[in-house]
Design a protein with these regions (language model features):
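Nucleotide-sugar donor-binding and catalytic loop/hinge architecture
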Residues: 71-72, 91-110, 250
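Nucleotide-activated donor-binding/catalytic signature segment of Leloir-type glycosyltransferases, i.e.
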Residues: 135-141, 150-184
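Membrane-proximal helix-turn-helix segments that form the acceptor-binding/catalytic region
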Residues: 2-8, 32-52
Length: 254
């Protein structure tokens, strides 16, 4: 309507698939009246826009699976992923440095996770994998917070998982200092079929900017970590498999 009123083109940017995300995470079923109403709105937006920009590379696969390809042509669908301001990243890396004994220890193989610590993030798998790691130099260092943190810290204490440390939350400006000193940055989340359309986590681009290897432990049809040779993907995210990859990569730091 605004496009017609002002005589201009309309471009819609889609960073998340709604309402599909509601269904994928089990918040509501596909036939829920609210989901059906949002689906109609979603299709209307896609049809009326002159161009669509998705942050997921495989978003047109989703459109095809919905049966909308005749009304929404491929030519008007574009992919622009999230990103990071490299100048700001480098500035923050130099001016907001985190002083941490593990980060500063050259004898520690630092596997770093930054981000939310909620049930959907499934950090319990990382604890299970850490228990299977054989290299004594490996430490999983977790920066972030969330409602699952206390329970996971309790697991670490009760199960004597000595190679995992929760560091707490830091301001975003300190993240470049942390991830740039990793030996391995960990891109981790609970798998959902939405990943088949691509991934564009903000923290993933912090990892790219850091220039350190990335371990991605969930299968993904469009994975920029693999596409651009920025790290390794674990197709079967079981604790033993993840631990084996970490042990293998730690050998290269000798």
């Amino acid at each position: 309507h605004l496009g017609r009123k002002w005589g201009c083109k309309t471009v819609a940017e889609i960073a998340d698939l709604w309402p599909e995300s509601i269904v994928a995470y089990g918040i509501a079923g596909p036939h829920n009246p609210a989901v059906l109403a949002l689906r109609r709105l979603e299709k209307w937006i896609y049809k009326k826009a002159d161009a669509l920009i998705f942050t997921m590379e495989g978003a047109y696969d989703y459109i095809v699976e919905q049966g909308w390809e005749k009304e929404i042509p491929r030519a008007k669908v574009h992919y622009i992923n999230n990103g990071v301001d490299l100048e700001q990243f480098d500035y923050n890396k130099e001016h907001f440095r985190v002083e941490d004994p593990d980060l500063n220890d050259p004898n520690v193989f630092k596997v770093i996770y930054t981000g939310s610590i909620r049930r959907v993030n499934n950090l319990g798998l990382l604890l299970d994998a850490s228990k299977c790691v054989k290299d004594p130099r490996v430490k999983l260092l977790v920066w972030g917070d969330g409602d699952e943190r206390a329970a996971l810290e309790q697991r670490v204490r009760e199960e004597h998982i000595g190679n995992v440390t929760f560091k707490g939350r830091v301001e975003k400006k300190y993240v470049p200092s942390i991830v740039s000193r990793a030996d391995l940055n960990f891109a981790h989340n609970s798998f959902t079929y939405l990943f088949n359309y691509g991934i564009s986590f903000n923290k993933l681009f912090d990892y790219f900017a850091a220039g350190q290897p990335i371990l991605c432990d969930f299968p993904c049809r469009y994975n920029p970590v693999v596409t651009y040779g920025a790290g390794t993907e674990v197709r079967d995210p079981q604790p033993q498999e993840v631990a084996a990859v970490i042990d293998h990569l730690s050998e290269f730091s000798d």
